[in-house]
Amino acid sequence: MAGSGVYADIIEGDVFKYYSDGEWKKSSSGKSVAIINPTTRMTQFKVQACTQEEVNKAMETAKKVQKQWAKTPLWKRAELLHKAAAILKEHKAAIADCLVKEIAKPAKDSVTEVVRSGDLVSYCAEEGVRLLGEGKFLVSDSFPGNERTKYCLTSKIPLGVILAIPPFNYPVNLAVSKIGPALIAGNALVLKPPTQGAVACLHMVHCFHLAGFPKGLISCITGKGSEIGDFLTMHPGVNCISFTGGDTGIAISKKAGMVPLQMELGGKDACIVLEDADLDLVASNVIKGGFSYSGQRCTAIKVILVMQSVADTLVEKVNAKVAKLTVGPPEDNSDITPVVSESSANFIEGLVKDAKEKGATFCQEYKREGNLIWPLLLDNVKPDMRIAWEEPFGPILPVIRINSAEEGIHHCNASNFGLQGCVFTRDINKAMLISDAMESGTIQINSAPARGPDHFPFQGLKDSGIGSQGITNSINMMTKIKTTVINLPSPSYTMG
């Protein structure tokens, strides 16, 4: 399905083209980058290895086209976004097929990601019209010592060219979460997709192409991060960077210079379970929060901090549910599918071996076939184990037994991450106090961590990020304030 039908223009031979100047192009490098299917561990797709000169050309065009796009009426911008959203949903099957083959996301979840992405784009259109359609009016005499001789008019104007870098795990959804706000705000956008997920992104970008956006307003540049990564993030034509991924973002933030940054860099999301918690509810949320998409989510539960008095019961309930998880290929909608790469699988295995050497209790036998790792609950994990602190990004979940809520809070806050967390208790007063004490961007009460709905604020503290996402916050972040002051010859008071 990939590269066929309406998508025939985006591929030549067995290599997908990149998108620039409103056209699908082959790179002058003559080189390509292979995309490995996580399930078969064989080359599934190839994409262009773009050059630095091709990056320059995309940036140059984006700068020019953005000036005109900024003068396009808000209603027209919104109209085109709604059209792109409809096309995206119409072709959800082809894009979902790419996700299945590139990142081993279960087929049903892949379709859900595309539909959710269409909804996000439409919401951006609506929210942008509301948000950007209003300005602010200030008068000077509210500040001491001033008469009403100055009228201040403020509005939000675009930043210019946005560089968007989404991660492999939600390449389409986390691309449009940057594209939608950028475009409705009047910006141009250059997309650097992840290698795993690049073809899904190219298919998604073609939907925007079919919607009729101005040529050059959107570019999708594929290639090796080692060759064009730093060149893109340090490019003088970039006016803002929106990045979702791992600790690469820290290096980007140090090199980016004087441009606004929106960064989400992973987490070690803690789940604190008190004695009065509904343990059946906890167990269900642990499965959903810890093992969906094989734990390859920034907002996955990464460590359970459970009170000693209820730990045995909770572990028993979770183990019963783990036993029912299906393991296999994404085409079969298995609960647990292969992790994205061999290097990821090796990293996860290293955490497992460390835990075993240091005495963790294995609730299941550790099993791995290629990139496929069976779900594993590790009980009696201690703070000296790597799994207590590091983000596995896989179906491995540690349980640390605690004797007080304060102990759980301390472990959460001792982490260098601070993305999300959750607390389970029937006492809302305790829940609020614990939420306030946890140094994380979002705390869920009686539910697993989650990104969304997509209009909710989404942010990380500490090494988990810079700034806040969510549709409204992203639109605001991709604009700046412009002020015009009208100076009157004498004070003027309404109806005075």
From Swiss-Prot:
EC numbers, comma separated: 1.2.1.9
Active-site residues (renumbered): 264, 298
Protein name: NADP-dependent glyceraldehyde-3-phosphate dehydrogenase
Cellular compartment(s): Cytoplasm, Cytosol
Residues reported to bind NAD(+): 245-249
Site (Transition state stabilizer): 169
Annotated residues for binding of substrate: 116, 169-170, 297-299, 451
Regulation of its activity: Competitive inhibition by NADPH, 3-phospho-D-glycerate and ATP.
